Amino acid sequence: MKRLIVDMDDVLADATGQFIDFYEKEFGVRVSRESMNHKDEMERFPDNHEAVYNFTFRNGFFRTMSVNEHSQEVMKALNKNYEVFIVSSAMEFPNSLAEKFEWLTEHFSFLHWRQFVFCGRKTIVHGDYMIDDLPHNLETFNGEKILFTAPHNLQFNHFKRVDGWKEVGELLLR
């Protein structure tokens, strides 16, 4: 069975939407996804970059992210056809490990906890396919690299790209 590595933030979970929501609650300004296109993390919001970064240290930031559309049904099908592992960087922010684990067990209850890998760097993982939104995670991966579209990666075109979970299903479940 082929091994599939899947990222969590901005792939399964809508981390960008969470930043937008937290920013609006904190500063009273709604930032559109479109305004974030082609911008790295520190440029996506007009002001208060340190405060935006600090959202990730707040209780509930990772636990309350929305699930990306169609990810659950496609992941359920992929789990029947691949050896699936959710691999997420979870060491930088104190609450992220526990919150990510709770989020995954709630929203992807058909996956076993042994399929969750929390790490500091993804260079340690190997597999046949990797789906991630961050190009630097894909660059060192040994298998087929699949870039999941997010506002911060639109300028990259040297990986196979998917624009959502329906496209993931079309690519990997044919």
Residue spans for each PLM region:
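Active-site neighborhood of HAD-like aspartate-dependent phosphohydrolases
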Residues: 1-51
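Short, acidic loop-to-helix structural element flanking the phosphoryl-transfer center
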Residues: 57-87, 93-98
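A structural signal for isolated positions on well-ordered beta-strands in alpha/beta enzyme cores
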Residues: 83-85, 129, 146
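Membrane-proximal envelope and lipid/glycan-remodeling enzymes
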Residues: 83-96, 115, 155-166, 171-173
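Substrate-recognition "cap/lid" segment bordering the active-site pocket of phosphatases
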Residues: 87-140
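Acidic, Mg2+-coordinating phosphoryl-transfer loop and its flanking beta/alpha structural elements
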Residues: 131-165
